[in-house]
Amino acid sequence: MEAENKDDLSKLEFNEYITNLVNDITSLHANKIDVNLILNQRDSSLNLKYIIPIGLILNELITNSIKHAFKKEGNKLITIQFQEIENGLTKLSYSDNGVWIEKQVDGFGTELLLVLSDQLDGKMSRKSSTTEIEFNFSEE
């Protein structure tokens, strides 16, 4: 993982960081499940103020998908999109094609995601009865 400037450790290259993070998390579960990832990510650096909560959010979501959503055989797909929408507003979208378990929406994982979203000064939303979650935040 490379800092944008060797003298400036406050920013990391987003693409490299997310790719390494996702590969590390999924490789821990490689014997249990095969996960295909589609990463639509922007090509830029990101301040550590944002990258740390985003990394924790993705760790929680990916681990949750692997542990709970992918119970059946077949293609397991996780989609992560990170894009600037407008005027500094950024959207992080996460979804998987696994099974949604309704009873777990108020658990510790959900609370953690809400706290991390607050750290981003952002907003978390989830589409009903699906594992599709969005985080919107401003990088300013």
List each language-model region with its residue ranges.
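Short beta-strand/loop element within the Bergerat-fold HATPase_c
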Residues: 75-88
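Conserved short alpha-helical segment within the C-terminal cytosolic histidine kinase catalytic core
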Residues: 4, 20-32, 53, 57-60, ...
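Glycine-rich nucleotide-binding loop
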Residues: 77, 100, 128-135
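Conserved DxG motif in ATP/Mg2+-binding regions
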Residues: 91-98
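Conserved short strand/loop->alpha-helix "switch" segment adjacent to the catalytic nucleotide/phosphoryl-transfer site
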Residues: 30-62, 66-74
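Short beta-to-alpha transition helix within the HATPase_c
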Residues: 8-28, 83
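Flexible helix-coil linker/loop segments in the cytosolic histidine kinase module
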Residues: 1-13, 68-70
